[in-house]
């Protein structure tokens, strides 16, 4: 399935990215990314992921499953939008290294009280352009390629 991107650009004058995020806050299902260039300078975009309950379920080969998901859920690139316009967002725990480093695979898998990898499918985001003081409201939908 190819993801189709729909967006609207509106003025963000008088708003801060943090204010926008706090209006949509969901502790477990939203996020706020600030971009920084060179470790010091604020970059162009702040990205706010709107709450979602859509998560990717992973089995015994999570890295292969993530690759397959990414391959089957390509997003069109639109000039003028940031490179990230939605997709997988989440975390890989420290223990995920066992899936990458062969010599660590023999170690006993620890019992975790949390997911080793947790990824949500972020289809609705707000991007704040820090230079232009404008907002991109972005929604991804899927079109069936069959």
Where is each model-derived feature located?
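Signature of the chorismate-utilizing enzyme
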Residues: 1-146
């Amino acid at each position: 399935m190819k993801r189709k991107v729909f967006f609207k650009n509106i003025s963000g004058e008088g708003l801060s990215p943090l204010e926008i995020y706090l209006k949509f806050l969901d502790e477990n299902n939203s996020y706020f990314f600030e971009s920084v260039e060179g470790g010091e300078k604020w970059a162009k975009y702040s990205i706010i992921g709107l709450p979602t309950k859509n998560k990717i379920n992973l089995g015994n080969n999570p890295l292969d499953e993530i690759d397959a998901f990414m391959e089957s859920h390509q997003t069109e690139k639109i000039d003028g939008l940031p490179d990230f316009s939605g997709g997988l967002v989440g975390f890989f725990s420290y223990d995920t290294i066992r899936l990458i480093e062969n010599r660590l695979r023999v170690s006993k898998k620890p019992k975790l009280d949390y997911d080793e990898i947790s990824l949500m499918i972020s289809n609705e985001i707000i991007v704040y352009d820090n230079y232009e003081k404008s907002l991109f409201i972005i929604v991804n939908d899927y079109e069936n390629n069959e």
